[in-house]
Amino acid sequence: QDLLAIDEIVMYGSNTDEMVAEIKDRYPNRHCIIYPDPASRQRKTRAGGRTDLSILQNAGFSVKAKNSHALVRDRINAVNSRLLSSDGGRHLFVSPKCKQTIKSLERQTYKEGTSVPNKDDGYAHTNDALGYLGEYLFPVRTEYATPQPQRWT
């Protein structure tokens, strides 16, 4: 199944209420499904102690959020598997209108010697957002064998 990024909203220094207003203004009378950070269940905004998730739900959006965060590597793998699957297929297509998304996918860096995204380069936020969507719809899990304790012989 393909994932199409056809538009983006980039707002610096905004809050959830402002984002809701922008979505409703830009896409009136549309059914919108939001895939937020799972922390939106607990995170309180500056506006009266409401959670980000409750603001989105009360605005009439369908909200799809897991109860807890997937591992960062699982979110990255979910997006990467859409960019290029194991069979060589491409399943993530980004419109040229999505300038920040394209820039973020091209320029994301990682902390030296790790697979941990560098949050200081200005590109992580857009990729995080794409990761929550990708991991919710197309989860990729790496199962690691649990080592069994060995008895001394």
Predicted regions and their residues:
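Mg2+-dependent endonuclease catalytic cores in nucleic-acid-processing enzymes, primarily RNase H-like
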Residues: 1-117, 140-141, 150-153
